[in-house]
């Protein structure tokens, strides 16, 4: 933002997998992020490996999930519904493949359906977009292109 070529009103973030959920966390904590794209980045905590949150809890990432909440999603004080809700009404594009073994698709839909109610309060339901390509843990080229168009549209950028 301190660089001349950065327009502080047109900052977006995009990430896949770990980068996908970190994009959502970034947006939740930094309102300068105006639009986000998450690819294969989350599912509901209860549906992440049948509720085993060990993958989230390693020492270099979120150790409190283990230390304080015993990797139990029922004890965790948040889920991705709340993360998505904090982003409203900002635009979020979600790539949630049908066969992602890491982030179960029905858990994504559970979170999105709940968060959509928050977006509705802002009359911004169209700002929460989900696609379900027929693939595994991947960000296929055609979905990437759709995500880039989403970013361009919401940041007001027209390719040259």
Locate each region found by the language model.
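Gly/Ser-rich "nucleophile elbow"/oxyanion-hole loop immediately N-terminal to the catalytic nucleophile
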Residues: 1-17, 33
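Alpha/beta-hydrolase-fold catalytic nucleophile elbow
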Residues: 14, 39-40, 95, 133
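Conserved strand-to-loop "acid loop" that flanks and positions the catalytic carboxylate
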Residues: 88-106, 133-136
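Flexible, active-site-proximal loop/turn residues at the rims of small-molecule/cofactor binding pockets
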Residues: 17, 42, 98
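Short glycine-enriched nucleophile-adjacent loop
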Residues: 20-31
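Loop/turn elements at helix/coil->beta-strand transitions in domains of secreted/extracellular proteins
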Residues: 8-10, 31-35, 88-92, 126
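C-terminal catalytic histidine-bearing segment of alpha/beta-hydrolase fold enzymes
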Residues: 112-160
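Mobile cap/lid helix-loop segments that gate and shape the active-site cleft of serine hydrolases
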Residues: 38-83, 89, 102-112, 120-124
